């Protein structure tokens, strides 16, 4: 209800300013200062004081007096009253606001906004198919998946794509190495999975190219070039050789994505835009551009008009295209098929992103359709990570460690559980997985993406602090309360519908009203976070929501309330809270356990 309430406040302020013949270009509607017990406030009096030739508090009083809240106006459904404190005009909500919030949040889908009619493609991860997913690249997956989930909650129709580089040098090296080396000459794979099996060939190939004698390296490079040129020429046999490697690796990597509950709707292969001629068509169009130059034996685009010093090379001297050339064709395909495109990129790709955007404009595209948020890297306490030589930390290793540590924590807490149900070994395994994977996802997505992260176990798995387990425990606690009410009272809470929940006047305490305020804010938080592509805002909301729920839990007994109707009212509030926290967790890709 916060969103319609905010609209009412904006209308009220604008109408009052019009009545007073004051400018309405900036209404100043915002969250009030902490010491002001209002839901929204307007600081517009600050801006207008000089033009009104009066002090901000007096201007605020005049504006507040001009707001018409008479019952017969029937303009405002949720504004109860307006007052001022200093220069702030403060807006307070009525009981209908709380009642409609409680009613709306009985829906398990609470927080989903109406359909926007907009189609969006979110491209993320897109790691080269050369081996297992690395921890650093895992941030792309976690951040990108959360952005896609957030946009779906915002009402967009979202497709998740993985752009597969199956045409570059690394794939050429991989294919050559796979065909050259015998499995018996390689170390045992670290896991029984295709990506771990095949990465051995890639690592051995790179070792060979670095350490073999010059003649052997030259011969190998000729074979690698033949593979790359064969792909560029659309040679079917070469394509099939490459796909034998690529498809196996992607199949293995998919297991890591599945562990994170990160879903891809489609893997878009780079060779698609070679084979269908789109990349060649882009080359011909770029050659005819006024800013096209032929320098250093390559066709380039001079981007100085876009304040980009480095030219974009789009065609090599041997007639082969580059990754960005093919990506230009890829993006034009996305523009043709979707209303908007989001590409999640590492911060080391900022120059390429700028070059891509500028060149797309040169090709006549509206790049307002394209957003390219960046993320920084993830480090473990012992330092940075790398993949090419196999010296980095794989995402699977991090998830295994998280689950193992979570299992230890669950075992340690068994004796202090409040609920009298028993946990089987399968329950403990489930909770350990939910908590361990959730800890990794939440700890990564809760940070602003452009800030580097050093992953710390004690923080990520802290059940008592501001972490995923702390928030997950709130959901489990809600489930436990509902189960206890069903088991120990005559109430059938499953029969409580949005039409039969008790009157909101039952819920009068500060803790109850504060929790309802947080529930009411959730859809607006989704809307704001989606507009800025900032899932960390949802993570922050979930954390503060958990704190507010725990205050309610400490101060307001549900099972031992003074009457059955009060129990019914409070359990309705608990269910509304459960739906809110479950969906906040869902947006950031964290499971909501029913027990812990």
Curated annotation (Swiss-Prot):
One term of GO molecular function: arginine-tRNA ligase activity
Pfam families: Arg_tRNA_synt_N, DALR_1, tRNA-synt_1d
GO BP terms: arginyl-tRNA aminoacylation
Keyword set includes DNA repair: no
UniProtKB keywords: Aminoacyl-tRNA synthetase, ATP-binding, Cytoplasm, Ligase, Nucleotide-binding, Protein biosynthesis
Lineage top rank: taxon: Archaea
Reactions accelerated catalytically: tRNA(Arg) + L-arginine + ATP = L-arginyl-tRNA(Arg) + AMP + diphosphate
Cited Gene3D superfamilies: Arginyl tRNA synthetase N-terminal domain (3.30.1360.70), HUPs (3.40.50.620), Isoleucyl-tRNA Synthetase, Domain 1 (1.10.730.10)
Entry annotated with the keyword Zinc-finger: no
GO cellular component, one term: cytoplasm
Motif 'HIGH' region: where in chain: 127-137
Subcellular location per the Swiss-Prot or TrEMBL entry: Cytoplasm
EC number: 6.1.1.19
Annotated CDD domains: Anticodon_Ia_Arg (cd07956), ArgRS_core (cd00671)
Protein family: Belongs to the class-I aminoacyl-tRNA synthetase family.
Name recorded for this polypeptide: Arginine--tRNA ligase
Species assigned in the record: Haloquadratum walsbyi (strain DSM 16790 / HBSQ001)
């Amino acid at each position: 209800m916060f969103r319609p309430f905010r609209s009412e406040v904006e209308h009220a302020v604008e109408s009052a300013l019009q009545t007073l013949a004051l400018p309405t270009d900036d209404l100043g509607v915002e969250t009030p200062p902490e010491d002001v017990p209002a839901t929204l406030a307007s600081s517009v009096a600050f801006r207008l004081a000089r033009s009104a030739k009066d002090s901000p508090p007096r201007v605020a009083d005049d504006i507040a007096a001009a707001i018409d809240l008479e019952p017969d106006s029937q303009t405002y459904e949720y504004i109860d009253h307006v007052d001022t404190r200093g220069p702030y005009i403060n807006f307070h909500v009525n009981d209908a606001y709380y009642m409609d919030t409680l009613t709306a949040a009985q829906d398990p889908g609470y927080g989903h906004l109406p359909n926007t009619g907009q189609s969006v493609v979110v491209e993320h991860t897109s790691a080269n198919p050369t081996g297992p997913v690395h921890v650093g690249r895992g941030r792309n997956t976690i951040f990108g998946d959360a952005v896609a989930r957030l946009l779906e909650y915002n009402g967009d129709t979202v497709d998740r794509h993985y752009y597969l580089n199956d045409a570059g040098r690394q794939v050429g090296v991989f294919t050559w190495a796979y065909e050259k080396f015998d499995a018996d000459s390689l170390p045992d794979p670290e896991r029984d999975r295709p990506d771990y099996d095949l990465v051995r060939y890639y690592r051995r190939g790179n070792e060979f190219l670095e350490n073999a004698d010059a003649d052997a390296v030259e011969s190998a490079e000729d074979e690698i070039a033949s593979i790359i040129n064969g792909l560029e020429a659309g040679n079917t046999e070469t394509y099939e050789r490459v796909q034998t490697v690529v498809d196996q690796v992607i199949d293995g990597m998919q297991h890591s994505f599945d562990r994170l509950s990160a879903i891809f709707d489609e893997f878009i292969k780079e060779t698609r835009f070679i084979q269908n001629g789109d990349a060649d068509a882009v080359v011909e169009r770029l050659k005819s551009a006024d800013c096209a130059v032929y320098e250093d034996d390559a066709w380039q685009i001079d981007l100085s008009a876009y304040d980009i010093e480095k030219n974009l090379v789009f065609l090599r001297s041997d007639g082969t295209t580059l990754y960005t050339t093919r990506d230009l064709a890829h993006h034009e395909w996305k523009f043709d098929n979707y209303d908007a495109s989001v590409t999640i990129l590492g911060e080391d790709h900022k120059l390429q992103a700028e070059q891509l955007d500028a060149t797309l404009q040169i090709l006549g595209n509206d790049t307002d359709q394209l957003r390219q948020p960046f993320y920084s890297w993830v480090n473990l306490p012992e330092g940075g990570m790398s993949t090419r030589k196999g010296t980095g930390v794989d995402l699977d290793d991090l998830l295994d460690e998280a689950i193992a540590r979570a299992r230890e924590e669950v075992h340690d807490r068994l004796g202090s559980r409040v609920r009298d149900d028993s946990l089987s070994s399968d329950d403990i395994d489930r909770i350990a997985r939910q908590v361990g994977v959730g800890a990794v996802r939440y700890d990564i997505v809760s940070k602003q993406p452009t800030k580097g992260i050093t992953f710390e176990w004690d923080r990520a798995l802290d059940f008592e602090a501001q972490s995923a387990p702390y928030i997950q425990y709130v959901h489990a606690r809600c489930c436990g309360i509902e189960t206890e009410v069903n088991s120990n009272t005559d109430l059938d809470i499953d029969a409580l519908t949005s039409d039969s929940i008790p009157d909101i006047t039952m819920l009068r305490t500060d803790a109850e009203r504060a929790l309802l305020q947080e529930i009411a804010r959730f859809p607006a938080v989704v809307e704001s976070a989606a507009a800025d592509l900032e899932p960390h805002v949802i993570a922050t909301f979930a954390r503060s929501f958990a704190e507010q729920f725990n205050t309610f839990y400490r101060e307001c007994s549900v099972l031992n309330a003074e009457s059955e109707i009060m129990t019914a009212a409070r359990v309705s509030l608990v269910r509304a809270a459960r739906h809110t926290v479950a969906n906040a967790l869902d947006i950031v890709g964290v499971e909501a356990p029913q027990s812990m």
